[in-house]
């Protein structure tokens, strides 16, 4: 049937049809890099990674742009407060760009661990000041902006469609709710395109209105248009960005005379103890702590168990349950790979039919607004039939089962990178198994069964374990 998405702008599910056949342009609002990422920062990247993987599976060429905000995002998300990165730089006694680099790489490392594909382009806001200045000047020339005391503000009431994404009406927006009243503003609803730098402000650039720095909203408008062009296919981000950030992006672009994003998608919050996970409140679980203690793919699986438009309530019990569920799928995939090597030639009709049903149910789920819970349910519904048929399954059908697991489970869901499919023994388990084999070898030596003793030693050597007999007893080391 093709992909159907819930379009926030249309307020309904709509068929997704790219502007240029065979090509898809996606812009996702990326992180403001002033601290380590928490679990809430992983949900959007994982969700839109599924979308990207789906398009790649379908043969599309995908340009996936996700920015890095390293300037201009103030502490209250509006036009007041301190730049978040500058504030952090003061706390850590670093230069702002040192802070941005440090936490940008922290974010990228976490995304790599979660098997999220790197963006085609990851533009940094600080590298696109000329584009922002050009857009600001264009808005001034068209009467949609005005300058006051070195700052430039967007004249919200000059754009009658302001509010069409969020459903908010100008008359209903109260001064002081999400915007602060400043004396130089014509209207309290107006927002900054360019901010005059106060004395001592570290991050500043020259502009026609004096030294300053960009407003948060203009950054994504300028960068998305630069890399994806007018009328690009999809803009996505968290539900908390819908207003004011995305609303302001639309106003800036369209008031400047540009066609902006054709479709909009928004993912919901990750909750902890019933409250939104957020840096500002400290109500969070850091991603790196989770990734160190748990299999990253089990964490990705956990994120996919809830539909992206629904709030996800994080619990430790839920994570443990997800680890068990992921383990069941991983075990089944490994079983298929292992049995394929020794299975007799031919096909197994019952398995072929089960695979047909799986592929149909899975793709229907994904194409219905990325219903990952239903896609996972299709995989689990397939497991009983698979386990029943595995003992007698033929090689060609097992090869197809492996390919289906790879296409659906890794190609689209991103759950089975090669490293998790390689069953490796390490740590205490490895040491225990070697100790057991050496004990059996010592028993054989005491019984003067040197043939068995030598056989154990040679088999261990073939596996890369070197055994050395000493006065204190046998020692072993891994061959380098």
Curated annotation (Swiss-Prot):
Give the record's family classification: Belongs to the class-I aminoacyl-tRNA synthetase family.
CDD domains registered for this protein in UniProt:
CysRS_core
- Catalysed reaction equations from the record: tRNA(Cys) + L-cysteine + ATP = L-cysteinyl-tRNA(Cys) + AMP + diphosphate
- Which principal EC class is assigned to this enzyme? ligase
How the cofactor binds, per note? Binds 1 zinc ion per subunit.
Q: Where in the cell is it found?
A: Cytoplasm
Q: Which Pfam families match?
A: CysS_C, DALR_2, tRNA-synt_1e
Q: Does the keyword Metal-binding apply?
A: yes
Q: Which SMART domains match?
A: DALR_2
Record-linked InterPro entries: Cys-tRNA-ligase (IPR015803), Cys-tRNA-synt_Ia_DALR (IPR015273), Cys-tRNA/MSH_ligase (IPR024909), CysS_C (IPR056411), Rossmann-like_a/b/a_fold (IPR014729), tRNA-synt_1_cat_dom (IPR032678), tRNAsynth_Ia_anticodon-bd (IPR009080)
The alphabetical list of record keywords is: Aminoacyl-tRNA synthetase, ATP-binding, Cytoplasm, Ligase, Metal-binding, Nucleotide-binding, Protein biosynthesis, Zinc
What are the required cofactors? Zn(2+)
Q: Oligomeric state and partners?
A: Monomer.
Per UniProt, the short sequence motif 'HIGH' region occupies residue numbers 31-41
- What does the entry list as the binding residues for ATP? 279
Name this protein carries in UniProt? Cysteine--tRNA ligase
Q: What EC number(s) are associated with this protein in UniProt?
A: 6.1.1.16
List the Gene Ontology MF annotations in alphabetical order: ATP binding; cysteine-tRNA ligase activity; zinc ion binding
Organism of this sequence = Thermus thermophilus (strain ATCC BAA-163 / DSM 7039 / HB27)
Find motif ('KMSKS' region) and give its ranges: 276-280
Per UniProt, Zn(2+) binds at 29, 220, 245, 249
Report the superkingdom from the record.
Answer: Bacteria
């Amino acid at each position: 049937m093709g992909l159907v998405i819930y379009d926030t702008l249309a307020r309904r599910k709509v068929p997704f049809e790219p502007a240029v056949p065979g090509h898809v342009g996606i812009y996702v609002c990326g992180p403001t890099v002033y601290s380590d990422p928490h679990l809430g920062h992983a949900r959007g990247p994982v969700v839109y990674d599924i979308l990207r993987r789906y398009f790649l599976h379908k043969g599309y060429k995908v340009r996936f742009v996700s920015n890095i905000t390293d300037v201009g995002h103030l502490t209250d998300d509006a036009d007041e407060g301190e730049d978040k990165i500058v504030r952090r730089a003061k706390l850590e006694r670093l230069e702002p760009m040192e802070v941005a680099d440090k936490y940008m790489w922290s974010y990228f490392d976490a995304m790599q661990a979660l098997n999220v594909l790197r963006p085609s382009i990851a533009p940094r806001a600080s590298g696109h000041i000329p584009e922002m200045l050009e857009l600001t000047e264009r808005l001034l020339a068209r009467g949609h902006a005005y300058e006051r005391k070195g700052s430039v503000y967007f004249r919200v009431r000059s754009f009658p469609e302001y509010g069409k994404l969020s459903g908010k009406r100008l008359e209903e927006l109260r001064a002081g709710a999400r915007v602060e009243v400043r004396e130089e503003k014509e209207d309290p609803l107006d927002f900054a395109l360019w901010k005059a730098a106060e004395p001592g402000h570290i991050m500043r650039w020259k502009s026609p209105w004096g030294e300053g720095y960009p407003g948060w909203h203009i950054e994504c408008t300028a960068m998305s248009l630069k890399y994806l062009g007018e009328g690009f296919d999809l803009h996505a981000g968290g539900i908390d960005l819908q207003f004011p950030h995305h609303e302001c992006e639309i106003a800036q672009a369209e008031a400047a005379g540009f066609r902006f994003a054709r479709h909009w998608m928004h993912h919901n919050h990750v909750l902890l103890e019933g409250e939104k996970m957020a840096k500002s409140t400290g109500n969070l679980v850091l991603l790196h702590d989770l990734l160190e203690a748990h299999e990253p793919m089990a964490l990705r699986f956990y994120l996919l168990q809830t539909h992206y438009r629904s709030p996800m309530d994080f619990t430790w019990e839920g994570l443990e349950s997800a680890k068990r569920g992921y383990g069941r799928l991983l075990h089944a995939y490994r079983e298929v790979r292992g049995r394929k090597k020794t299975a007799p030639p031919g096909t197994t009709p019952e398995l072929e039919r089960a695979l047909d049903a799986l592929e149909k149910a899975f793709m229907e789920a994904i194409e219905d607004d990325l219903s990952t819970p239903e896609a996972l349910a299709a995989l689990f519904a397939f497991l009983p039939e698979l386990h029943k048929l595995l003992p007698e399954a033929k090689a060609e059908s097992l090869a197809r089962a492996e390919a289906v697991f790879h296409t659906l489970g890794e190609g689209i869901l991103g759950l089975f990178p090669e490293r998790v499919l390689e069953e490796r023994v390490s740590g205490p388990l490895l040491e225990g198994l070697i100790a057991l084999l050496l004990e059996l070898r010592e028993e054989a030596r005491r019984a003067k069964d040197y043939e068995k003793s030598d056989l154990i030693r040679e088999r261990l050597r073939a596996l890369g374990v070197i055994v050395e007999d000493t006065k204190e007893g046998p020692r072993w080391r891994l061959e380098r």
